[in-house]
Amino acid sequence: MDTEYQSFVETLRAGQKPEFPAHAKTIEYARELDAHDKLSQLRSDFNIPTKGSLRKKALDGGVAGETKEPRVPNGVSSATKPNGTVNSDLKDDEASIYFVGNSLGAQPKCIRQYIDAHLETWASIGVNGHFTSFDNSPLASWQDMAAACAAQSVDLVGAKSANEIIYMNTLTVNLHLMMASFYRPTAKRHKIIAEWKPFPSDSYALASQLHWHGLAPATSLIEIHPPNPTGSSPPTLTLTTSHILATIDAHADSTALLLLPGIQYYTGQLFDMARITRHARARGIVVGWDLAHAVGNVELELHAWGVDFAVWCTYKYLNAGPGALGGVFVHGRHHSFHRGGGGSGGVGGGRGEGGDGDGGDGGDGDGMALGYRHRLAGWYGADKAVRFEMEKVFWPAEGAAGWQVSNPSVVDLACVRATLGMFERVGMRALRDKAVLLTGYLEWLLLGLLADGVGKGGDGEAAFRIITPGHPADRGSQLSLLLRGGLLEGVSKELADGGVVVDVRKPDVIRVAPVPMYCRFEDVWGFITVFNRALDRCA
């Protein structure tokens, strides 16, 4: 089975479909795959919500999956029902099928240790925690925490060095900060190219940035639509690379910024970031990527691809918790810092890395006046050597850290540092290997349901279709299922009642994401079993 497992991975990596045996539809086969999964032990490092904990209505001191008896405020055992009888439903202790890591990752158990270390540091040495860390602490001093997290992320995002990364704020705030620095419209180049169905927060950010510059989305925002998305049957919801490149060419002379998602949140489509970036930059367009669904999900080479900037969150595939700090990548060619700049007082010493002739101003003029690329500045973006000297003159910190504005939340950074350590130990290649097989197995079983006519309507219409691209190189860990009209509410309830957690997007889509760090092949089989039953009952 080891050989077969690896053969499946290699086949999928090559863009082909593996030939699963007929008995692959059984739970025994799914368990065989789990037995040969070299990453299976990672699951024990997470708190996976149980079927019982998902129904919890009040805090009781317990944590899903822990074997110790939870503490209950009124002293009644959690194994006792409200009427005083013992709850014999052992299924309450079973882990749920948690296929929603594309919305919020499961909780790593080690996060408590990191948060406790921060709280003890704060309680023990107070303000000195800004500059001091304990020898046996997993944390750096508070003012060095963001940089420590950046150092952990070099391989994760494919940066040249930690200088190209910083953790701060949350994703949309960081997107605004990056656009304030990199979207510098002129009378000739004022357009932003985006895709037709971005996450709403990105739409709000794009529109507000255009309005900030006195521009109108109707004339300055180009949305790339699928060719005839409503006229074909079934409608096309994804974008081909050639169509994206053609749109870039059509608007190249008037475009200032291209901003796309690495993975489209709704369809789960993974874009060819290397080719698109290269094509746009060759036409003088600044390229930014929203990597909310890509970091921790797929392999990235942001520096080698020449990406100007990128932003991402850490609460999805990175598992750092709801609202955790976001990440930012700024290519080294934008780090230039020339002594003698004027304007608002920026001075420096010619720092920068990976320069390719762009300098520090990106051609907008302001950078040469300031001595560095224009940005919205704040005290935490100042050079650490002078940060506490209370100077009025802004001296940017080296690299992406120079785009910081405010003191980051250390308790959030503790969570980020904890989970990044897990990615350091495992590596993205191993995670991606498992991910392509998990998703490939899920797709094969789903296609089996369609072939069997499960849930087919009276007019012969299928119960669902997979709107995520079929080629493994064109998707991450998510498969999006577009249900036949009228099925979503009933199917969603059946899934929830069966202990399955997925993301529901009205009117008709469920997003299914078996994340390789903590999801099993048995979970994939279990999802298919519950989904099959749901379609039978609701069709």
From Swiss-Prot:
Residues 60-87, 340-363 are annotated as: Disordered. Residues 75-87 have a biased composition (Polar residues). Residues 340-352 have a biased composition (Gly residues). Its EC number is 3.7.1.3. Coiled coil: none annotated. The modification N6-(pyridoxal phosphate)lysine is found at K316. Disulfide bonds: none annotated. It is found in: Cytoplasm. GO terms for cellular component: cytoplasm. It comes from the Eukaryota. Its cofactor is pyridoxal 5'-phosphate. It catalyses: L-kynurenine + H2O = anthranilate + L-alanine + H(+); 3-hydroxy-L-kynurenine + H2O = 3-hydroxyanthranilate + L-alanine + H(+). Pyridoxal 5'-phosphate binds at L171, T172, F199, P200, S201, D202, D290, H293, Y315, W379, N407. InterPro entries: Aminotrans_V_dom (IPR000192), Kynureninase (IPR010111), PyrdxlP-dep_Trfase (IPR015424), PyrdxlP-dep_Trfase_major (IPR015421), PyrdxlP-dep_Trfase_small (IPR015422). GO terms for biological process: 'de novo' NAD biosynthetic process from L-tryptophan; anthranilate metabolic process; L-kynurenine catabolic process; L-tryptophan catabolic process to kynurenine; quinolinate biosynthetic process. It is an enzyme of class 3 (hydrolase). Pathway: Amino-acid degradation; L-kynurenine degradation; L-alanine and anthranilate from L-kynurenine: step 1/1; Cofactor biosynthesis; NAD(+) biosynthesis; quinolinate from L-kynurenine: step 2/3. GO terms for molecular function: kynureninase activity; pyridoxal phosphate binding. Keywords: Cytoplasm, Hydrolase, Pyridine nucleotide biosynthesis, Pyridoxal phosphate. Homodimer. Catalyzes the cleavage of L-kynurenine (L-Kyn) and L-3-hydroxykynurenine (L-3OHKyn) into anthranilic acid (AA) and 3-hydroxyanthranilic acid (3-OHAA), respectively. Belongs to the kynureninase family. This is Kynureninase 2. It comes from Chaetomium globosum (strain ATCC 6205 / CBS 148.51 / DSM 1962 / NBRC 6347 / NRRL 1970) (Soil fungus).
